[in-house]
Every structure is written in C-alpha cells, then in structure tokens.
C-alpha cells in the first residue's frame, strides 16, 4: 500500500537532504565496497525472485483492471526472462571499470604547473519514470557504481514492484557499509512529489525522466534542476538502392516487431524508389507475417505498389502528414518511398526525434554520408535500431537515453553520470 504522507514538501526536503549527505559518502567510497554492495543486492534479489514477481503480478492485475495502455503494460511486466536480464545487468555493472577518480589529459604548462582532469560523480540524481520496474534496479546500480546518490520516483502503476526491489537495495547498502540513503525509492505516489523533486536545486544535481512524451515535456518545462532526456523515439530505417535484400528484410522485421513499447523501435520505413517495386512487397509481407495485427500506413507511392497484394489485405491504410512525426509504440508502421539518400537524410532530420536511425546499404560512401549527416544520438549501418540500448552498447545498463547534445548523448551509462574537474599540481608556482 502507498504510504500516506501529509506534508509532501517537508518529506521531499528530508529526502533531498539525506541524498546530499549520502552522496558525499558515496563519492569517497572505494570500488570494492561499491561492487560488494551490488553483488549482495544481486544475491538477495535472486533469492527473492518469487516475492518480486508476486509484487509485479499485483501491479499487472491492477493495471489491467484500470485499462492501462498496452505499451505501458508491456513495460510494466516482469517475467522470468526479464527478471534474469535485470539481475545480469546488475552483475555487468559490478564488472565494469570504476570511472571515479580516473585522471586524463595530464600536461605540463610553461608556468611549471601540471594539470589534468579527474572524473567525479554528478552528486544527486533524481529519476522519474513510468512502469519499467527494471529501471529501479538499473538506475540504482549505475548511480551506486558511479558514486552518486539517487532518488527514484516510479509510476503508481509499478508501486508494489518498485518497493519490493527497493527493500533489497537498502539491505545490500547496509550490509556493505554504504549509506542507506544512497538509494531512496519514494514511498508515495502523490504527483506533488514530482513537482518538488524537479525544483530541489539545493539537493539535486540532475533529473533523468523516462516515460511518455507528456511526462517528459512537463518535466522539461517545469524543472529548475538540469534534465537529461529524450522526448520520444521516432526511429527510421532507410532501405537504400544498394541494400542487401536479405539484410533489409531481417533488420526491418526485427526493428519493428521485436517489441513495440520501446523507444528504439522503428516507426517509419523509408525505401529508395529504385528498388521499391521489387523489395518493398517482400519487407511488408515479412513484417505482417511476424504480427497479424500490423497496420501499414502508406504514402501514395507505396500504396500503388502494395494495394493489390493479397497477403496484405486488411493491413493497409493511407498515411497522413502526422504519421511521419509519430512514435506509435504499437503494431503500426509508416511507410514512404523516397527519392534517394539526400531525400532520406532530409526526411529523417526533419521528422525524426534524433534518437536512432538506420541505413541498410552495401555502398560504403553512402553509409558514411548517412552516419555523418543524420543528426541522431545513434546512427546505424545494416543493424536493427533495437540495439540502441545501454546493455547492448556494453554499458552494463542505462539510466536513460539522451537526444540532447550537452553533457550526455545516446544511452547514458556510468560515464554519463559523471563529470570532470580540473586538478592542478604545483611546486609553489605563483601567477606573474
């Protein structure tokens, strides 16, 4: 049950102060203690699997009874495989090199001083997210390993799951001798707590929101604390005239149908007009075969090619202008015939969300132009957009994905939760 808190402002001030105090201790914690805490949490959660999954079932049942959106239900669900992947991510973070204290760019200046840069924690991270109970553990593990304290505010739909996971995070911190307030999962679903968290400039150094476009837009507008974010994931796959047909089909099917409720799912398929007559029907048939619920929203040129295809009956409709700007998070795919590489790049940079975009081609010069000129956090050649993920990038896990250009861009792992400070060694030098 949600804890009733009468004075949200006072509660959040207390949470913030505890986090700031804990952040100073965590910044000085050694790698061994941080890894020990992560592995203790791993073992305890492994033993508590049935308890965690039972808590998630409560959330899922409540979500269904409240008619929660299908994409949110998908994100909310914890099954055996997702639970194991969540735990593996924890072990992967423990195995990563500790970035804190790393010194780079050491150089001597003519004055005699020696200077360089040292990697340090950001301090206190505030995380606001919907569904996805795995984010509770991923964010906590990344914050802990990078020496940050973190305040986690999950959605009300995942309250039982998050609290069950939080219990073992707290236990692991205590057993490892680290501050118990290093990871705090808010014990309220009162939305006023979000408003307080994003304005706690005295205690919080950065906010990371993960959720729907409305949530992130609101936080970006109202926050007084810096925000690391992406608004949505309108990801494209461009099938170039020099594409390998087998790769084009395989990647397109995976990019669209692997999972719908993720920000790295393909939402628009662009096909070069030079190969559209031959290849588009094969791709469309394969995507529809992978999911009979698929709806293809077509521009005029692609409709001309596909409208008489018996295998696609009932799956076709006309695209509107808004389709090119839409993240569906559903079995819906916008399809457009495009006049070559220049038009593809222009379409993506105009309508995309600067998240992840893909070219399928065997032409090296075209691929290099695409990755240089497409203005996205991740740009891929001959691979599914579903790879745009901290785990797949070798980050162990990710606290989020940023489409901003300042501080962090793309999947945000350990280094994204750090900054660098200048360090100077002297021998009594003075400025003349």
From Swiss-Prot:
EC numbers, comma separated: 1.2.1.41
Gene Ontology CC annotations of this record: cytoplasm
Keywords: Amino-acid biosynthesis, Cytoplasm, NADP, Oxidoreductase, Proline biosynthesis
Protein source organism: Psychrobacter sp. (strain PRwf-1)
Record flagged with keyword Cytoplasm: yes
Localization annotation: Cytoplasm
Family: Belongs to the gamma-glutamyl phosphate reductase family.
Record NCBIfam families: PRK00197.1, proA
GO molecular function: glutamate-5-semialdehyde dehydrogenase activity; NADP binding
Transmembrane stretches, start-end: none
Catalytic activity field: L-glutamate 5-semialdehyde + phosphate + NADP(+) = L-glutamyl 5-phosphate + NADPH + H(+)
Record function comment: Catalyzes the NADPH-dependent reduction of L-glutamate 5-phosphate into L-glutamate 5-semialdehyde and phosphate. The product spontaneously undergoes cyclization to form 1-pyrroline-5-carboxylate.
Listed name of the protein: Gamma-glutamyl phosphate reductase
């Amino acid at each position: 049950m949600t804890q009733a808190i009468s004075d949200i402002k006072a509660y959040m001030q207390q949470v913030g102060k505890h986090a700031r105090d804990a952040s100073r201790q965590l910044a000085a914690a050694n790698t061994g203690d941080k890894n020990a805490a992560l592995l203790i949490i791993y073992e305890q959660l492994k033993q508590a699997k049935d308890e965690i999954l039972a808590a998630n079932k409560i959330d899922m049942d409540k979500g269904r009874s409240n008619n929660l959106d299908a994409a949110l239900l998908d994100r909310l669900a914890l099954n055996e495989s997702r639970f194991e992947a969540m735990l593996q991510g924890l072990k992967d973070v423990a195995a990563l090199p500790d970035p804190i204290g790393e010194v780079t760019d050491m150089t001597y200046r003519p004055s005699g001083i020696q200077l360089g840069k040292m990697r340090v924690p950001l301090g206190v991270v505030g995380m606001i997210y919907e569904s996805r109970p795995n984010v509770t553990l991923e964010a906590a593990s990344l914050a802990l390993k990078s020496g940050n304290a973190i305040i986690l505010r999950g959605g009300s739909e995942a309250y039982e799951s998050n609290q069950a996971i939080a219990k073992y995070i707290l236990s692991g911190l205590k057993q490892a001798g680290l501050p118990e307030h290093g990871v705090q999962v808010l014990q309220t679903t009162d939305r006023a707590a979000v408003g307080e968290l994003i304005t706690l400039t005295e205690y919080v150094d950065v906010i990371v929101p993960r959720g729907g476009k409305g949530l992130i837009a609101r936080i970006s507008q109202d926050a007084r604390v810096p925000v690391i974010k992406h608004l949505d994931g309108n990801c494209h796959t461009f099938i170039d005239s020099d594409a390998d047909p087998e790769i084009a089909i395989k990647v397109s099917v995976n990019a669209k149908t692997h999972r719908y409720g993720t920000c790295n799912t393909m939402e628009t398929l662009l096909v070069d007009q030079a190969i559209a007559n031959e290849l588009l029907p094969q791709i469309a048939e394969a995507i529809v075969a992978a999911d009979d619920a698929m709806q293809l929203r077509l521009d005029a040129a692609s409709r001309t090619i596909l409208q008489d295809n018996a295998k696609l009956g009932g799956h076709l409709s006309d695209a509107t202008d808004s389709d090119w700007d839409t993240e569906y998070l559903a079995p819906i795919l916008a399809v457009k015939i495009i006049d070559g590489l220049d038009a593809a790049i222009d379409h993506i940079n105009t309508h995309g969300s600067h998240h992840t975009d893909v070219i399928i081609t065997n032409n090296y010069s075209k691929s290099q132009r695409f990755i240089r000129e497409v203005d996205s956090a991740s740009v891929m050649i001959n691979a599914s957009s579903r790879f745009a993920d901290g785990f797949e990038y070798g980050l162990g896990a990710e606290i989020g994905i940023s489409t901003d250009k300042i501080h962090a861009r793309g999947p945000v792992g350990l280094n994204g939760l750090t900054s660098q400070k200048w360090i100077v060694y002297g021998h009594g030098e003075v400025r003349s």
